[in-house]
Amino acid sequence: IDRYTELTGKSPMLPRFAMGLHVGTYSGGTWKNEEMTSDKYPPALCKRLREEGVPFDLLWLDSTWRLFNTTYGNGGCCFEWRNTFKDPKAMFDSCYAQNVKMVGLHIRSILDNGPEYHLLDKAREQGNVLYPGAKIEGVVNFFDPKAVDWWWENGVMKVASIGAKFVKTDVGGTMDLKGLHNIFPLAYAEAPYRKFQEYNNMRGVTHTREGYAGIQRYPYIWAGDWGSEWQWFEPVIRCLLYTSDAADD
């Protein structure tokens, strides 16, 4: 393991509270029920968990906070809130007032247009932001520091500036090129990990699904879209034990 981590990197220290329980929510509306989401739901969930004595420290909002546009539907990310979230900043503030340490958001590597920011069009106009070897136009070129800076300033800061403190990265396996298919998730996970670490002025945290040798440098790893029954949970335990043996977390 020492030789492996000397080559691929070691897991960094995390904020102490990041070792606690993480809770995810669809904000009251799961897939195909997005109209049921509300910015009132996450604070109400926090309140209920506190009342029940559930000790959690991190909360993230899964996909349904995002406005799904017609270009890529739920597969793209325009960093715009759906209209059921009337006051996202107040939502973040309410969660933090209940001693939640970090609130994060699920995102995708594919940019999309929204009615306000037109992020995909702006990336096209900027040039050198999107990766030309992706299966779908719109994937950010996370190998290029300048593209990462543009993505951060024009996309992520729309949510970080009002309270998001980390992201849950999804759709990391978007490269057709075999030589980059496994490397892309590393660059994708590194970008928000380092950016939020600097912006929050604390040890970094991110959630990533895809990875490769070295992904342990940007923890955490999440297991993907699994059910809550034991038939799903048991293999996750086995998987994470193997991952731990590989020094990934």
Question: What kind of region is each of these model predictions?
Answer:
Residues 1-245, 249:
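Catalytic-domain carbohydrate-binding cleft regions of carbohydrate-active enzymes
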